[in-house]
Amino acid sequence: MNVSLKINLEFPAAIYFQDTLQLNRYTVALELCTATQDHEQINVAMARIKAFVYSELADTVFINQQDAERANILEVMGINVTTLPEDPIDQIIGLMLYCKINAVVEGRMLVEALDISSFIGDEVTYLYNAGDPIGPFQQDGWWFNADTSHNELSGIGIDQNIVHVHAHNWNKYNLNWNDVDYSKTSKTVAFGKRSDHAK
């Protein structure tokens, strides 16, 4: 028997819009329906939603992905960045959450409705129901990935030819599915320097 649930989420973040950084706070209400009878997988799905919102998106800077140079500068400075296909207004952030949350739960649950409001948005609530058009999120992007990614920045460091490859799987939260084998990946790759003993 499938079960309908409602989750309320609240998290701080910022937006970079019109060359200005503005602090904001978001309130999100999710209506979900379970799609499996496996209670352990339902618990993992719920925990993934909370981990993504409270640990990955909290204190992020939402920015239009067209402003790639600014986004990369922010990331090099150590700032948590989330890129979006359009300007970071509440409606776009809500659509992103709808797509990404459906992705991270990988069919164990379904998002049936999502409401979002924010402090900057003057507490106006945007409503989204399953089946509504997803607009700019029809294009391929990280919002369809089941991992914890929330941007597609290069991750290239500014010193010593180092690339920092972020591990976006669920290992760090211990939230993998019990029937899937996830491999661990290295986080740092050196390039551009010839080995001293290479001929």
Predicted regions span which residues?
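Histidine-centered catalytic/metal-coordination loop motif
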Residues: 8-99, 103, 180-199
